[in-house]
Amino acid sequence: MSDTIYVGATYRGRVKVYNREVSPAALVAPDTLVITVSPPGGGADSTYSLAAGTLTTLAAGDYTFGHVCTIAGVHEVESVSVIGVRVGVGQDDFTVIARNV
C-alpha cells in the first residue's frame, strides 16, 4: 500500500492503529496488527500486538519524531516512519501520523 497510515491515540499511551482504506470496523478477527517501534539512534525495539480496531498500552515516549515503526497483519508488512506528532489538550491527546517508506 502506498497510503498514509495514521496511528491515532487518545490519552497518553493508549494507541489505536488504522488507515484510510481499511477502517477498524472493516477488519475481521483474527486480523492482528503487530507494531515494532525502533528508537532513533539504536536501542532495544518494542513490539506490540493488538487486534484491529482495539487499543493497547505503549511505553511512554515510544512515538516521537524519528522513531521507525513496522506494522504487519492486515495485508502485508508495512514499514513506516513517523513524520509528525500533533499534541492536543494537556499533551495527553495526540495523533501520530506515519507513512510508508
Stretch-by-stretch model annotation:
Residues 1-101:
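Contiguous segments within soluble domain cores/interaction surfaces
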